[in-house]
Amino acid sequence: MNAFTRAWYALERHYQDTRHVLLRDRFACEPDRFERMHERLDGMLFDYSKNRLGEDTLQLLCNLADAADLEGKMRALRTGAKVNGSEGRAALHTALRLPDGADAVYVDGRDVLPEIRRELNRALKFAHSLDDGSYQGITGKRITDFVHIGIGGSDLGPAMCVQALEPFRRHITVHFAANADPACLDAVLCRLNPETTVFCVASKSFKTPETLLNAQAVKAWYRGAGFSESETACHFCAVSADTAAAAAFGIAAERVFAMYDWVGGRYSVWSPVGLPVMVAVGGARFRELLAGAHAMDRHFFSTPTRHNIPVLMALIAVWYNNFQHADGQTAVPYSHNLRLLPAWLNQLDMESLGKSRASDGSPAVCKTGGIVFGGEGVNCQHAYFQLLHQGTRLIPCDFIVPMTAQGREDGRSRFTVANAFAQAEALMKGKTLDEARAELADLPEAERERLAPHKEFPGNRPSNSILIDRLTPYNLGMLMAAYEHKTFVQGAIWNVNPFDQWGVEYGKQLAKTIIGELEGGTSVHDASTEGLMAFYRECRLKGGGAA
């Protein structure tokens, strides 16, 4: 039996030995529990004391990390080793946020920092030229709107950041169009003036069908407004690893910004893919975002496991996923401007870790990935929190809470924070049947006994609380980097590659075939797919569908 298997079995035995220990009892017996089980970094506090674990659990989880060679895998990530084995690539998103003066970072023997600096500065310069009005549309009018056309990692990260940093917005309004459904882009275009709008096409391969369909639709919009091809080109920029393909589309080289094949899409907001963030909040604020992420990088790569925030987040997630058989994980930002964070986390975690094969291609030997979902607090308290409190499923929760409001402070911010703290406490403590009866003491006994079971809460429902003093670019960068590194650590423990996404590609492959068959002709599919295609054709004949 190897060290990893021994560490795994030790955790399985430990779970059986401690499964009946209640969190409320742990807090009653451990008055210093919070002091021992929270970490701070700059303006962030990570409280993990409301989890079903003790110091012995943490030690066993740290043993598992050691047995998985987490330290070696972290070093490989940091130094540009090809940690994305299936695609033979490094994963150097951390290099994108290195400050000036950092040591060289090599990919295939080449220092990539000069290229990173050059492309970042080019993107920042272009964003500034839009902001100060020095770059204008073909008719000489100042640019007022910027539309980012991308999908997946080229959309979710930038869109979330722009939304989160709305209070820092400068002059230009930034829009996003991801879905190929015509209603998505049409809803944006109907509000815009083609003379005062710039469009950014973001696609690593410059072959993403949804993105190119929307980009072609924008070209048609310009033609309909009387613009020539060359005039239209002045209103386009691009971010891609295939700069030649962007040029072939008609975008001038000086407005094509490079992505890198050693950065995955869902980790790319730190690159020129973050151009809409630069446009929205300005170069100085974007650099603050990078600085916050780098602060978390330094913490991650230099802090011992027992006090390492992303590592603790990941080990706790492994504890629930693999040993307590949790049914999912929810993330709840108590901030209206962070309402897109759960969608970003959904992709980051599930696309990275939804793998049934180990890094070497053999079958995964344990349950990997997990269902990650979330919503905006306080709203989701009136939606799915009922299941968290009294349902039969175990779903750990991350509460993400800024301490200071971004909007007008009139008591509503305090109400929001109080609700976050109250929900975490209620999930942990629960309410016993006797406590429920005591609350109903004024009722007749029969009515009290009838209602009390419905007001009982099992409690012992775990959560992390991630607090930030304010929602700033720096703190947002720290928060995002913490979750990126959490995802990497989970992949390291499970021995899966968090940087590929082959499952996404297969559906795209089939869609290429089906799209040509929807209008008729020969097709060979299963009976269900054939039936769906037949119904589409029927609706089209009746005039019930659009191209």
Curated annotation (Swiss-Prot):
* Family matches, as Pfam families: PGI
- Family in the record: Belongs to the GPI family.
Keywords noted in UniProt? Cytoplasm, Gluconeogenesis, Glycolysis, Isomerase
- Which InterPro entries does the protein's record reference? G6P_Isomerase, G6P_Isomerase_C, Phosphoglucose_isomerase_CS, SIS_dom_sf, SIS_PGI_1, SIS_PGI_2
Q: Name one GO biological process term.
A: glucose 6-phosphate metabolic process
Origin: domain of life: Bacteria
Q: Which NCBIfam families match?
A: PRK00179.1 (NF001211)
The EC number(s) this enzyme carries = 5.3.1.9
Q: Where in the cell is it found?
A: Cytoplasm
Named in its record, the pathway it takes part in is: Carbohydrate biosynthesis; gluconeogenesis; Carbohydrate degradation; glycolysis; D-glyceraldehyde 3-phosphate and glycerone phosphate from D-glucose: step 2/4
- What stretches pass through the bilayer? none
Q: What does this protein do?
A: Catalyzes the reversible isomerization of glucose-6-phosphate to fructose-6-phosphate.
> Which sites are catalytic?
351, 382, 508
Task: Answer whether the UniProt record assigns the keyword Isomerase to this protein.
Answer: yes
Catalytic activity entry: alpha-D-glucose 6-phosphate = beta-D-fructose 6-phosphate
Q: Show the GO MF annotations.
A: carbohydrate derivative binding; glucose-6-phosphate isomerase activity; monosaccharide binding
| Main localization of the protein described in the UniProt heading | cytoplasm
PANTHER family listed in its UniProt record = GLUCOSE-6-PHOSPHATE ISOMERASE
Q: Write the protein's name.
A: Glucose-6-phosphate isomerase 2
Q: Which GO terms describe its cellular component?
A: cytosol
Source organism: Neisseria meningitidis serogroup B (strain ATCC BAA-335 / MC58)
